[in-house]
Amino acid sequence: MNLHEYQGKQLFAEYGLPVSRGVAIDTPEAAAEACDRIGGDCWVAKVQVHAGGRGKAGGVKLVKSREEAKVFAVNWLGKRLVTYQTDASGQPVGKILVEACTEIERELYLGAVVDRSSRRIVFMASTEGGVNIEQVAHETPEKILKASIDPLVGAQPFQARDLAFRLGLEGDQLKQFTHIFIGLAKLFQEHDLALVEVNPLVVQKDGNLLCLDAKINLDTNALFRQPRLRAMHDPSQDDPREVHAAKWELNYVALEGNIGCMVNGAGLAMGTMDIVNLHGGRPANFLDVGGGATKERVTEAFKIILSDAKVKAVLVNIFGGIVRCDMIAEGIIGAVREVGVKVPVVVRLEGNNAELGAEMLARSGLNIIPASTLTDAAVQVVKAAEDNP
């Protein structure tokens, strides 16, 4: 679960981390009032969405009057922001963060994630702040500095000082960076976070450090013991198809292609998407119905896939182990009849009761295309999508 920037900064402030004075608003009038409350003669207005790239998409603006802040709010509230991290429809804008301006000397990066290989929280820092850190890691990995946190003793000041020296900080900045580092580590552990990022962590003209941005991702599995953070969830930022899928314990991620995929097992689902791509197709989604698939869940999976208007064909790839292929076939038949599927459906069944499942599909009288192998299935579904403009 993601938090908005303004929510992340509220948490930062509670842990004593330096953040800009700001106000989250949801009306144009409140935007003008926020400028008065903050004071000064210039402010930064930032739309609040769960996506990066806001600045390049016009969602961040320096405003120099109350009226300019109000106009920015009028232009964005209730609209959708499209960035390189969103789909073509973008994310809805329900709030805008108005902040005091900051005079920036340098931009750094500081973040932490759970490293699955070491099973520890790992902090990452870089002199390349304010840019896409994944790009920095790919192009200049030597610029990514790391510190692994021992779960028995927690984050240590010496680790912070080591990173600070290597970032080129000096004097009182070392103490400030250590305070931020220890505070983020404490925040991470006490709130069951999966990721926290300060990008950029800036050195101001006066030499002091400031957390200019806040990105927080919570471990969804731990939300039951974080009721306060759970209440911060903004459902407007969720894809309604993914919300629907979660209710049926389906793992669904929307993509940009036109071939719907329904598979049991995450590994097989990724392999299916790869082979569809290999044969010139573009998957419209990742959908894992899981090992405990039922007729009802298969029906709901079809509804979710077909709610995407871009889908021109559907590939069902099932390996029967725990789940029986005949039960999946029954679900497919019921779903096609109930939903009224209008696009070609290619089905490949293998494993437990696969032959029985194939017979049921053949006897159904429905326009379902059988496939004998995964390659055959990929070739057929790509052709079907191309033939269905």
UniProtKB/Swiss-Prot annotation:
One of its GO terms (molecular function) is succinate-CoA ligase (ADP-forming) activity. Residues 9-244 form the ATP-grasp domain. It catalyses: succinate + ATP + CoA = succinyl-CoA + ADP + phosphate; GTP + succinate + CoA = succinyl-CoA + GDP + phosphate. Binds 1 Mg(2+) ion per subunit. Pathway: Carbohydrate metabolism; tricarboxylic acid cycle; succinate from succinyl-CoA (ligase route): step 1/1. Keywords: ATP-binding, Ligase, Magnesium, Metal-binding, Nucleotide-binding, Tricarboxylic acid cycle. Its EC number is 6.2.1.5. The keyword Nucleotide-binding applies. Pfam families: ATP-grasp_2 (PF08442), Ligase_CoA (PF00549). GO terms for cellular component: cytosol; succinate-CoA ligase complex. GO terms for biological process: succinyl-CoA metabolic process; tricarboxylic acid cycle. Mg(2+) binds at residues 199, 213. ATP binds at residues 46, 53-55, 99, 102, 107. Its cofactor is Mg(2+). Belongs to the succinate/malate CoA ligase beta subunit family. Heterotetramer of two alpha and two beta subunits. Succinyl-CoA synthetase functions in the citric acid cycle (TCA), coupling the hydrolysis of succinyl-CoA to the synthesis of either ATP or GTP and thus represents the only step of substrate-level phosphorylation in the TCA. The beta subunit provides nucleotide specificity of the enzyme and binds the substrate succinate, while the binding sites for coenzyme A and phosphate are found in the alpha subunit. This is Succinate--CoA ligase [ADP-forming] subunit beta. It comes from Azotobacter vinelandii (strain DJ / ATCC BAA-1303).
